[in-house]
A protein has these predicted regions:
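Extended terminal
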Residues: 2-49, 251-253, 298-299, 338-348, ...
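N-terminal amphipathic/hydrophobic interface segments
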Residues: 37-109, 233, 239-240, 245, ...
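Elongated, acidic membrane-bridging lipid-handling scaffolds
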Residues: 41, 162-269, 274, 332-433, ...
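Flexible beta-edge/linker motif
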Residues: 89-155, 169-194, 220-222, 227, ...
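Extracellular loop and loop/strand-boundary signature of outer-membrane beta-barrel proteins
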Residues: 110-111, 274-278, 440-443
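Transmembrane beta-barrel strands of outer-membrane/channel proteins
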Residues: 142, 260-262, 306-308, 424-426, ...
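Outer-membrane beta-barrel and related beta-rich outer-membrane complex signature
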Residues: 152-154, 316-320, 478-486
Length: 559
């Protein structure tokens, strides 16, 4: 039988190649690798294209950012009244559609220096979590903003007849970003107010704020829908926190209902402001907590506690302040007549601990000061017009730093004028400590003696009932060592006054006693209750402590 040769396998057959061995399926279908030189050239080309593209984007972005900055600056200033804004830079990110503004400065046109606000960075972006709820809104984040206002700027703001809601602030903020803002945050901001003394500013540092749901996209109508929280450091050592809800869309102005808490707030920085009410403040630490509501339809404050520690407070009366005192009294009378005060306030408890409270009269020929030191005062259930029921006050301390002082009072709703009961007792006060008062009203000096006074005062239905009874013990108004440099005539007056005190003495106890009747009718039922208290007590006190001294000195002068 004839044998035939097997045909040689071709390279396309799935058999072993005589040169390369068995051939794998699809081996010739793989792309051949480029030479190393060609691969380097392609990589370099891609890098060059990417760099060129980035350069083009950077150039376009830079020009667009400048165009955006100028456009936004113009739009903002077109909406503001009395203020102007400059922007240091602006950038719009194409990836998340966020807008960043840098180095924003706000100036008051009437008083441009210093700027009223500086904003290093403001970021506006889409609020993505609300987008999942099919609400297209935005958020704004202010990083390290600072607000700086001085007295001239504040006075200019108060003079402006344009309402705050019409000055364009909300429109200016909305001009920044095409979407409505629903979340606003402030991070590590600062607020500074400078009154007359730039060395004692009113300042809040480390200020943080968060306001959510501003557009009310989640809550029912008729409620305060926007959670709000703000906190900061007050005057370097104090701390304040406010937390509650707001309605930013209410008209004509936003409403708020919130709780607040103040801790260890130093009060001395308020001295420049308190001086406008004739009050001088030194020291003092404030703690307080409560809640308030302030809106177009309802306004009310409920303060649970106000506690002030180690305060020195003086009420100053001078010829220059007399007009202001009359004006404040008239304003208080108008408020008392108004059945709907601007904001009713109720204070559950007010406490003044270990403090000094005084009255300084610089309008007298011989200025004098009366004070109670180591004062502890507690007032409970204090409300506007005492409409929340009777308020009760209790006071203890040392009169003129020596005698013990006690006082209590009950204040009732004043529908027909001031309505209250008051009792005061001062025992064992040093008479020499009151020489400034004695010189002012009696033109005399006391070198020895103690003073006590007891008083009860009641006002109801415009009828005043009460008395002031002083007891002056071991009084001596003449001393040769003290009188060496005094005019002879003045020495004679003091000898006469000294003789008078001995005539009035109760011999067994070596005391001078008299009683001043306070019965009568209240002339002005619209007077402030505090004005009535101060006037009655001070007038009766002066008459009681100088029983007949004025008369005898005047008689001696005529002789």
């Amino acid at each position: 039988m004839k044998l035939h040769k097997r045909p040689a396998f071709s390279r396309d057959a799935d058999h072993e190649s005589p040169r390369t061995g068995p051939r794998r399926i699809g081996e010739d279908d793989k792309p051949q690798k480029a030479p190393p030189e060609q691969r380097v050239s392609r990589s370099l080309l891609w890098w060059i294209l990417a760099a060129a593209l980035l350069l083009i984007v950077a150039i376009v972005s830079r020009h667009f950012d400048e165009f955006l900055r100028r456009t936004l600056e113009t739009k903002i200033n077109q909406r503001l009244h009395g203020y102007s804004v400059t922007l240091g830079g602006a950038h719009l990110s194409p990836f998340n559609f966020s807008l960043t503004l840098r180095d924003g400065v706000i100036r008051q046109q009437a008083h441009p220096d210093p700027p009223v606000a500086a904003i290093p960075r403001l970021t506006a972006s889409v609020e993505w979590k609300e987008l999942l709820r099919f609400h297209l809104v935005a958020n704004a984040v202010f990083d390290r903003p600072s607000v700086h206002v001085n007295l001239p700027q504040l006075q200019e703001e108060n003079k402006d007849e344009v309402d705050v809601e019409d000055r364009g602030w909300q429109d200016a903020l909305q001009a920044i970003y095409p979407l409505k803002f629903n979340l606003i945050q402030v991070r590590e901001g600062a607020i500074v107010y400078v009154d007359k003394d730039p060395k004692r500013p009113f300042e809040i540092t480390h200020w943080n704020l968060s306001a959510e749901n501003i557009r009310n996209v989640r809550s029912a109508q008729g409620v305060y829908p926007s959670p709000v929280r703000t906190e900061g450091v007050l005057f370097g050592t104090g701390r304040g926190v406010l937390e509650g809800h707001m309605d930013f869309l209410s008209k004509p102005y936003p409403g708020i209902h919130a709780l607040y808490k103040l801790e260890k707030v130093p009060l001395e920085r308020l001295g420049m402001i308190s001086s406008r009410a004739n009050l001088e403040i030194e020291g003092g630490i404030l703690d307080s907590n409560g809640e308030f509501e302030y809106g177009p339809k309802h306004r009310e404050a409920h303060i649970e506690d106000v506690t002030i520690h180690k305060l020195r407070l003086d009420y100053i009366h001078t010829a220059a302040t007399a007009g202001a005192e009359k004006e404040r009294a008239a304003q208080a009378a108008e408020v008392a007549q108004d059945d709907t005060p601007p904001m009713p306030v109720k204070i559950d408890r007010f406490r003044l601990n270990d403090s000094l409270v005084g009255v300084v009269n610089r309008n007298a020929d011989d200025p004098y000061r009366l004070f109670v030191s180591n004062a502890d005062l507690t007032v409970t259930n204090l409300s506007s017009g005492f409409k929340g029921g009777p308020a009760v006050a209790k006071l203890t301390g040392k009169f003129m730093g020596s005698g013990t002082a006690r006082g209590s009072a009950t204040f009732r709703e004043d529908n027909n004028g001031p309505d209250f009961d008051m009792a005061i007792a001062i025992e064992g006060a040093s008479l020499p400590s009151m020489n400034d008062l004695l010189r002012s009203y009696g033109k005399l000096d006391v070198v020895k003696g103690t003073f006590s006074v007891y008083s009860e005062i009641s006002i109801q239905n415009r009828q005043i009932k009460g008395y002031v009874k002083p007891l002056i013990k071991d009084v001596d108004v003449y001393d040769s060592k003290q009188d060496k440099k005094k005019p002879v005539l003045k020495k004679i007056y003091e000898k006469i006054a000294g003789g008078l005190s001995h005539i009035l003495e109760n011999q067994p106890r070596d005391e001078v006693a008299t009683v001043v009747d306070l019965s009568g009718t209240l002339d002005d039922p619209n007077s402030s209750i505090w004005e009535v208290v101060v006037r009655l007590v001070s007038n009766a006190f002066v008459k009681a402590i100088l029983p007949g001294f004025d008369h005898e000195v005047e008689k001696a002068q005529k002789d």
